Amino acid sequence: MAGTPQPRALGPDALDVSTDDLAGLLAGNTGRIKTVITDQKVIAGIGNAYSDEILHVAKISPFATAGKLSGAQLTCLHEAMASVLSDAVRRSVGQGAAMLKGEKRSGLRVHARTGLPCPVCGDTVREVSFADKSFQYCPTCQTGGKALADRRMSRLLK
């Protein structure tokens, strides 16, 4: 929240960063953008579900290298962060605790929608699983039609 002091272990609140701030936070970072924007020490307030939504709106692959995003991609990412998170806050205002999870799900386009059509282009929403995490994305909107490798079975094949 704006004006609320942040604990030292957290990065700046996702709704408080400017495009220039975001560029500075990502500069030189060799991590995958999905991992970087969910790292609360880098940017606070973005979890797994909303990172999927933000990257979908921004049309950025979850596997893109954070520090190599173009200026246009940074602008799209910043705008997507603001719109997705602001919309989530608007939808949750006045909701009781029992209703929050359902309200959150009602606004999701790709997260937890594996196998369903993308609401933007109609392609099938895909999932990549690795370790104890997974993410959902649209190949057409985010990766130029390329399906990303699912790491779910790779540890069993070694």
Swiss-Prot record:
<dbReference type="GO" id="GO:0009274">
    <property type="term" value="C:peptidoglycan-based cell wall"/>
</dbReference>
<dbReference type="GO" id="GO:0008270">
    <property type="term" value="F:zinc ion binding"/>
</dbReference>
<dbReference type="GO" id="GO:0006289">
    <property type="term" value="P:nucleotide-excision repair"/>
</dbReference>
<keyword id="KW-0479">Metal-binding</keyword>
<dbReference type="InterPro" id="IPR015886">
    <property type="entry name" value="DNA_glyclase/AP_lyase_DNA-bd"/>
</dbReference>
<keyword id="KW-0863">Zinc-finger</keyword>
<dbReference type="Pfam" id="PF06827">
    <property type="entry name" value="zf-FPG_IleRS"/>
</dbReference>
<dbReference type="InterPro" id="IPR010979">
    <property type="entry name" value="Ribosomal_uS13-like_H2TH"/>
</dbReference>
<dbReference type="GO" id="GO:0005886">
    <property type="term" value="C:plasma membrane"/>
</dbReference>
<dbReference type="GO" id="GO:0034599">
    <property type="term" value="P:cellular response to oxidative stress"/>
</dbReference>
<dbReference type="GO" id="GO:0004519">
    <property type="term" value="F:endonuclease activity"/>
</dbReference>
<protein>
    <recommendedName>
        <fullName>Uncharacterized formamidopyrimidine-DNA glycosylase-like protein</fullName>
    </recommendedName>
</protein>
<dbReference type="GO" id="GO:0003676">
    <property type="term" value="F:nucleic acid binding"/>
</dbReference>
<dbReference type="InterPro" id="IPR000214">
    <property type="entry name" value="Znf_DNA_glyclase/AP_lyase"/>
</dbReference>
<dbReference type="GO" id="GO:0006281">
    <property type="term" value="P:DNA repair"/>
</dbReference>
<dbReference type="InterPro" id="IPR010663">
    <property type="entry name" value="Znf_FPG/IleRS"/>
</dbReference>
<dbReference type="Pfam" id="PF06831">
    <property type="entry name" value="H2TH"/>
</dbReference>
<dbReference type="GO" id="GO:0016799">
    <property type="term" value="F:hydrolase activity, hydrolyzing N-glycosyl compounds"/>
</dbReference>
<feature type="zinc finger region" description="FPG-type">
    <location>
        <begin position="109"/>
        <end position="143"/>
    </location>
</feature>
<keyword id="KW-0862">Zinc</keyword>
<dbReference type="GO" id="GO:0003906">
    <property type="term" value="F:DNA-(apurinic or apyrimidinic site) endonuclease activity"/>
</dbReference>
